[in-house]
Amino acid sequence: MGSFSLTHWIIVLIIVVLIFGTKKLRNVGKDLGGAVHDFKQGLNEGTDGKEAQKDDVIEHKKDEDKA
């Protein structure tokens, strides 16, 4: 009794579509997808900066060794 069956989820989905409409749900999906994309892009930019700093440190050490 604690878990929902497939028919329960279908009924819930139909009720949600009737209440909000497909256009509003589509907009929510686009907004959520954009937020996830921006979040992942921000994470990638953060790691790129760290890798660039490591490369700079390595190059700086090589320059010191040559001098």
Swiss-Prot record:
Pfam families: TatA_B_E (PF02416). The keyword Transcription does not apply. One of its GO terms (molecular function) is protein transmembrane transporter activity. The chain crosses the membrane at residues 1-21. InterPro entries: TatA/B/E (IPR003369), TatA/E (IPR006312). One of its GO terms (cellular component) is TAT protein transport complex. It is found in: Cell inner membrane. Residues 47-67 have a biased composition (Basic and acidic residues). It is a single-pass membrane protein. It comes from the Bacteria. Residues 43-67 are annotated as: Disordered. Keywords: Cell inner membrane, Cell membrane, Membrane, Protein transport, Translocation, Transmembrane, Transmembrane helix, Transport. GO terms for biological process: protein transport by the Tat complex. Belongs to the TatA/E family. Part of the twin-arginine translocation (Tat) system that transports large folded proteins containing a characteristic twin-arginine motif in their signal peptide across membranes. TatA could form the protein-conducting channel of the Tat system. The Tat system comprises two distinct complexes: a TatABC complex, containing multiple copies of TatA, TatB and TatC subunits, and a separate TatA complex, containing only TatA subunits. Substrates initially bind to the TatABC complex, which probably triggers association of the separate TatA complex to form the active translocon. This is Sec-independent protein translocase protein TatA. It comes from Neisseria meningitidis serogroup B (strain ATCC BAA-335 / MC58). The lineage of its organism: Bacteria, Pseudomonadati, Pseudomonadota, Betaproteobacteria, Neisseriales.
